[in-house]
């Protein structure tokens, strides 16, 4: 018997819905990206330190949330990260910290900038180093010229290091920007001069944070990670693939980096918290008061 037009339409609609559902399920099964904090911890088997809320935009003012909107959900995420790092430093002091990611545009520079601000706001003396000598971004985030910085300090070892450091405009936070891009960043970062710079910075501040290139893009992060007290791997929700995050982790492990944990960036589930207050007062300081040194007289970069 011939089907009525209405019944034929119903069958066609049902078949279309089933096909669409099958496609959605297939895409979900094929999706290898990290989407939740527990995904991140399961994929890497290292502590998940914080989930950072998605920001409202990509302008410098919107990205540096700890400066412009510190009480927002995103700002709360950086305070949680700060607190968890303080507890990580109980057994071993944390003076030098490296921030990296598996691939580009996953939030490592934004994370480094906001974590540096969060630590400075808690009374720490912090130096933020833009060690990404390939695609630096800290000068844009803080609205500073990039005509002087780490690359110049590496190429002019006889000049005092404070000549290359500038003020951030925030109490407790100084910046060593990337400076002009060199033709051989990996060689410069692997030099003895860089080792001396790391030691001098660590002696002059409570915490020194290094923003480095992605681990799977260049060897730069691996060169520095071996010298650091701790390393954090940033993953971007819905962008970072599990297999690539695992490859980045394996490379860091191979150079014996001290991995403190991972951070999930742009987490769209982080819209707020049941309690805005965390036990930061009970968290131990990253360094003892005796650690603090007489800071250099910093000259703003013109």
Provide a role label for each language-model segment:
Residues 85-88, 178-218, 225:
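Phosphate-binding/switch loop-helix module in NTP-utilizing enzymes
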Residues 1-9:
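Membrane-interface helix-start motif
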Residues 43-48, 226-233:
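Gly/Ser-rich helix-loop-strand patches that form or flank binding pockets
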Residues 152-181:
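Nucleotide-state-sensitive switch-loop elements of NTP-binding domains
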Residues 212-217, 228-246:
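Conserved Switch II/interswitch segment of TRAFAC-class P-loop GTPases
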Residues 96-98, 125-127, 173-175, 207-209:
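Residue-level preference for the first positions of well-ordered beta-strands
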Residues 9-125, 131-151, 183-186, 192, ...:
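Short boundary/hinge segments that flank catalytic cores
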């Amino acid at each position: 018997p011939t089907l009525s037009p209405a019944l034929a339409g119903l069958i066609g609609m049902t078949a279309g819905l089933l096909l669409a559902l099958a496609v959605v399920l297939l895409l979900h099964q094929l999706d290898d990206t990290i989407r939740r904090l527990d995904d991140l911890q399961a994929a890497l088997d290292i502590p998940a330190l914080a989930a950072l809320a998605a920001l409202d935009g990509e302008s410098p003012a919107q990205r540096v949330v700890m400066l412009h909107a510190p009480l927002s959900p995103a700002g709360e995420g950086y305070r949680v990260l700060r607190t968890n790092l303080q507890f990580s430093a109980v057994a071993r002091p944390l003076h030098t910290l490296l921030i990296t990611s598996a691939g580009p545009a996953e939030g490592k520079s934004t994370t480094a900038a906001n974590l540096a601000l969060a630590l400075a706001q808690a009374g720490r003396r912090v130096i933020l180093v833009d060690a990404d000598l390939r695609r630096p971004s800290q000068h844009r985030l803080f609205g500073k010229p990039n005509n002087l910085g780490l690359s110049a300090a590496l190429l002019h070892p006889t000049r005092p290091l404070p000549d290359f450091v500038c003020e951030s405009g925030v109490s407790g936070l100084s910046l060593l920007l990337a400076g002009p891009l060199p033709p051989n960043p990996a060689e410069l970062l692997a030099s003895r001069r860089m080792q001396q710079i790391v030691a001098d910075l660590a002696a002059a501040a409570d915490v020194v944070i290094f923003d480095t290139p992605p681990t799977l893009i260049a060897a730069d992060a691996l060169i520095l990670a071996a010298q650091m007290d701790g390393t954090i791997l940033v993953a971007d929700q819905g962008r970072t693939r599990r297999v690539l995050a695992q490859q980045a982790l394996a490379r860091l492990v191979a150079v014996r980096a001290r991995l403190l944990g991972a951070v999930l960036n742009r987490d769209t589930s982080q819209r707020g918290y049941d309690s805005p207050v965390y036990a930061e007062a009970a968290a131990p300081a990253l360094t003892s008061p005796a650690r603090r040194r007489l800071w250099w007289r910093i000259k703003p970069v013109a």
